Amino acid sequence: MATDQERHDQGMTVRRAVLSDAHVDRSIAATTDLTADWQDFITRVAWGDVWSRPGLDRRSRSIAVLSSLIAHGHHEELAMHLRAALRNGLTIDEIREVILQSAIYSGVPAANSAFRIASEVFAAEPGSAAGD
């Protein structure tokens, strides 16, 4: 079994690959005494344990995450994970399909919000078809 430090190191590697060095550096710089344990926890558990598992590739994990964030209305996290989905190889067309599929199970208002957020993210994202 991996040590906490090994899990943290693996988690940081995956977290940086998925979210970008710049995003992770901003998160670390914003860490306070209140949030330090939280940052360690999400790095070890979310990124080191779950995102590092071999059962799904990162594209598939991004689809699962987008669907969940849309369903629960977590808009700030949705914007972050839309960018991550592009980094993980999803296309804008595939993300559109994820949002459309989510509308059936999460509702039209959830999809409306997701499409608005996706439009904003893609417009600002260098290299995406909507951001060129």
Describe these PLM feature segments:
Residues 1-59, 87, 112-132:
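Acidic, glycine/proline-rich low-complexity segments that act as flexible tails and inter-domain linkers
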Residues 42-46, 63-70, 98-103, 114:
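Short alpha-helical scaffolding segments that buttress acidic/His motifs in well-ordered protein cores
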Residues 63-66, 70-96:
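Mid-chain, well-packed structural core segment of small domains
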Residues 77, 101, 108-109:
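Substrate/cofactor-recognition hotspot
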Residues 91, 108-111:
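Alpha-helix boundary/capping and short turn/kink residues
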Residues 104-105, 122:
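Short Asp/Glu-rich motifs
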